[in-house]
């Protein structure tokens, strides 16, 4: 079965070898990356894949955050143009049906306007999957507690009748801080007709 991988890679360029391994593994149709740490002038190419990215720089001009989608050239796809200030990109990908895949990153220190989230959903053709690192805590996706960002995401999920695709496990353990980072993915209820399964690999990559 074709699958989608979501990974907070914390620098695309430093993880190129691992990303290439993912690309050449069987059935990796689409790879959603967060915290790519790329600047607009940075060149990033991978053979037999299209790369759709949104770079981000902090106030000092250093690469910070950023998202990207890698899609196999063997899979029909088209880029969705998003008009959002959020760190997000989206691609329409052919599985057994056409599905919009969106990757999204929320920096921990940045507030997220609910209106921006609502506008993002309005721009995504259905059915869609949103994958990302939202830096939010909630028992709904494996955290032991709930923070303000987590409650905001919970409300967002309820407002748009989205289905969480997490399996309830903690999704990323940060060795230095000894804390779990949160990879969350969700989709409208209609997506279940496509028979997606969700799991977390030992490498803390979310696989759908």
What are these regions (language model features)?
Residues 1-208:
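A shared catalytic/ligand-binding motif for oxyanion handling
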């Amino acid at each position: 079965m074709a699958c989608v991988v979501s990974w907070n890679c914390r620098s695309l360029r430093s993880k190129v070898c691992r990303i290439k391994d993912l690309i050449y593994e069987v059935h990796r149709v689409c790879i959603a990356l967060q915290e790519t740490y790329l600047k607009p002038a940075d060149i990033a190419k991978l053979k037999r894949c299209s790369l759709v990215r949104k770079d981000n720089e902090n106030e000092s001009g250093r690469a910070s955050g950023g998202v990207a989608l890698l899609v196999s050239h063997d899979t029909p796809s088209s880029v969705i143009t998003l008009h959002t200030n959020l760190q997000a990109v989206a691609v329409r990908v052919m599985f057994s049906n056409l599905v919009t895949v969106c990757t999204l990153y929320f920096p921990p220190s940045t507030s997220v306007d609910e209106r921006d989230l609502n506008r993002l959903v309005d721009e995504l053709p259905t059915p869609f999957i949103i994958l990302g690192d939202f830096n939010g805590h909630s028992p709904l996706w494996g955290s032991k507690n709930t923070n303000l960002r987590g409650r905001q995401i919970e409300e967002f999920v309820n407002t748009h009748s989205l289905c969480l695709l997490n399996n309830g496990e903690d999704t990323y353990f940060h060795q230095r801080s000894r804390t779990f980072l949160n990879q969350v993915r969700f989709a409208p209820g209609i997506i279940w007709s496509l028979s997606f399964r969700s799991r977390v690999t030992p490498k803390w990559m979310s696989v759908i």
